[in-house]
Amino acid sequence: MTDVVSDFDHVYNIIRNNYNLNYYLNCADRSNNVCTIKYLQERKSYFCCAVDESTGRCVLHRCVLIVFGTWLDKKFRKKEFSGGDATCGGGGGDGDQDQDAIDERSNIKGTFMIDGRFLSFPNVMMNNNILMHNFYDKLYSKNCKRMFLYGNVDEEKRINRAIQLVYDDHEDVLFARDVYAKDYVVSENLNETLETYLRSSGKWEPLNFLFDFDKNQTDKMFDRIKMIMRAEINYSIDSLSNKIIYKHAYLTHLLYRPVLKMYQASKIDSAAAVSESNGSLRKLGGNQSGAMYPKDCKKIVDTIVNGKLIHVISKTFSKQKKNFLNHQDNSSNNNIEMCPPMIKYRVGNEVVRIINDNMRQDMLKQEYDFVKFVDSFFHGEMTVAGKKFFLCRDVRLPNVDYESIAKKFKDLIESNLIVRRDEDENGSGGDDDDDEWLMIAFNNRPTTFSCKRKHLVRIVYEFKRKRFPVEIKLSKSILFVNHHEGMICIRKQVRINEKVNISALLTPYEYHNVESIIGQIGARIVDVDHVSALMSKTLQYYYRSHLHIFATIPVPKLIVSVTNLKNAMPVIEYDDVEWNENRDMFIRNLPVGNSVVASPGSVHNNKMINLWTLVRDSRLMTAEDPYIPNVTLPVKLFNNKVNRLKGKMVYASKSKTPLVKFFKSESNNFVDTNEGHVLAMAGVIVSNVKINWTHDGKRYKIETCKNKSFYIFKIYTFLRKIRSQRIELIDAKLSTLNDFVYVKFSIVTSTNNLDGIKICGIHGQKGVMNSSEDLTEWMAEDGTHAQICLSPVSFLSRQSNFDYIERKYVVRGGDHTDPSAVRYPMFRIPYMLFNNTPEILQRIPQTNYTGHEKIEGTRLDQWSINQSFAGNRWAEGLQCVRGGTNLPDSSGEYKVLTSLLHCNNVIVN
């Protein structure tokens, strides 16, 4: 898992400390430097400015994205963090504490805000093009390896050109493709060109001393690169060893870097100009206040708003034209909208895989090395083979830090564990001596350093201890040391020589591969195999007392359970004291949409409630739906509906000043209609100009009348009437922007009638609540009674089990003194509630592109068919596939099936 808040804290510190910039909410009004969540939710976006105090100019103008929970957020919302910031000056009153509690309950840390919506950006997985990788090109052959050498940096055009090296295994030929896409065979006369690219990488400047080649080494450059590219790659393109995952914070930092570099260059130029004129040059021309790079800052904001941060890495993505927008494809906009309160630990752990449209099914394979790195159960969109998934709890995505890598190399040079060595010192005949030496390559590039094989254990110890983010591979006479952007690591203990334990970060290659350096030096990974190792922190949190079910109930039921977790209504705890004292505040701070409010004894977590469950039937009521609830449950359903009505003021004369006044309803003003609806009044608007309202006439009712001077608009809204419904709050608010008028209308309703609500148990048994029954006659000795009944047929057919679950024994009628009375077990099971909302209709495309679009909830596209097949396929079927041809080799179908089954924790030997 990753910590988005600490990652962004790091980015803000770099901008502040390395470039001496100060943060302001608005560089035009620096005295007003505070805001609130309520202010931001009025369709505001949460960006700030980074200002150079010495000149007063704004460098990053209204484009620094502020993430909730970071120190920068606390600086601007310090009034809301009572006692949370040194500059609070004592904080505020009760309102501040309430807001702090809302922050905690809504779990908004790690998200950002655009247009009043909470958003999060997932980590992005791509193929690793930084290191050498297998490559297939029509120009060469099927068995090639490719590597990009960066280093031809053009500061003026702000690009880092790369040369592409392609090595053909069969022919032992090295090809190169230069920046103008000319192909040529590499020979010794290209050594100097290669050296140019290697000497200054353009990516890891602090490590340039590793590539300080002398004449002898330059002459051997061609052979050294060939030697590196001969190293065998024993994993496929679909392996996690061949992937990198980009963090949100890293991509954001890359987005700001070109502007910050321009600013740094301009500072150096202006300092030089001032010194040349002996300090007499005071004004450097141009506007000395305002934004320095307005166009660049506008591009930054557009990139963030459109969810196209990945374009910072890959120019190819930004050049791709999409003719058909696919609603199931995430590559168009990667921003994920979050409705608070969010699922815990979701932000920062969600990964989306950028995939190529024409290779969709191939790219979805999960190889064996995904195990323990990617959550085997929780796939955010129920995509089993996974375009979208979660990282396991022990997985880390380390920050790129070439300075610390350079320091580590210098320490090893001081210790004489690695030395600068020229092969010609020992002549060409010292084969035995050469076997003793290992050439060191950094990120698959040859360096000027080598080490002795006998020092290997010590070098691995120095590199891997204290969770240092470095990958080490050993291939024949080359020691590969890798540290680059997007590294994926897992936190583990490694025991060296059966004596020394170190805390290490291991990559998928080091952890899973048979040729891992851990095995080659005789070390071993100290591992405790438990089902929790296959899970993300999200799943460990929500299922922490029921982890045994992941190994004991069928996979399809687990998929039902974890998918419904995502869709479940939020659960909010309350007690009678809080309800009586702070009822109004409690209602106003409810999340938008449906929520479950339950007593403290019933709340399991913010998505589940505990109910005492009896396995029984009553008059075959559970034949269709497996649940019968008690007539009274310690649960209330609340609905917080927010409508926004927009109108435009129409007036011919520009000299006329429009006047608008809004009178909202003093009390909860509503009336029942005959058609099963409720008509609620928002209020009355009086205006001296006409207002044209944008609405379809179905949700709102607007009555208009006018006299000589004014127009009067009475605004009503309709809501559906349900049984036992109570209207808790009707509130309305008016705001204006230019010629537009906005009315925000909130209605909070509650009900204790749960008939027809969908419910899902933690074991994946879902159904609609049937008509309720009095279950108080099923009484335990301590007075606890049954709260819900579960169908016995459903329990058996879903292969559920109630092991390790709290239980009590009940007697019908509650007379425990009768020794002949039958004792029935009753179980305390966590449940999720969710309702059928018509929001799914918004996701159904109006036009057909492929003919496989979702229609009325039935999923018939290739994607969903594939997922259903994968999720419900049993392992036994594999033997038929393998044995069908009576050949020892596995068939193609077998490989696809094993790949899909890795997602269901079935490892096939």
UniProtKB/Swiss-Prot annotation:
GO BP term, pick one: DNA-templated transcription
Cited InterPro entries: DNA-dir_RNAP_su2_hyb_sf (IPR037033), LEF-8 (IPR007025), RNA_pol_bsu_CS (IPR007121)
Organism: Spodoptera littoralis nuclear polyhedrosis virus
Enzyme class: transferase
Family the entry assigns: Belongs to the RNA polymerase beta chain family.
General function of this protein: Required for late and very late gene expression. May be a component of the novel RNA polymerase activity induced by baculovirus infection.
Pfam families per record: LEF-8 (PF04941)
Entry keywords, A to Z: DNA-directed RNA polymerase, Nucleotidyltransferase, Transcription, Transferase
Key word Nucleotide-binding present: no
EC number: 2.7.7.6
The name this protein goes by in its record: Probable DNA-directed RNA polymerase subunit beta
A single Gene Ontology CC term: DNA-directed RNA polymerase complex
UniProt catalytic activity: RNA(n) + a ribonucleoside 5'-triphosphate = RNA(n+1) + diphosphate
One Gene Ontology MF term: DNA-directed RNA polymerase activity
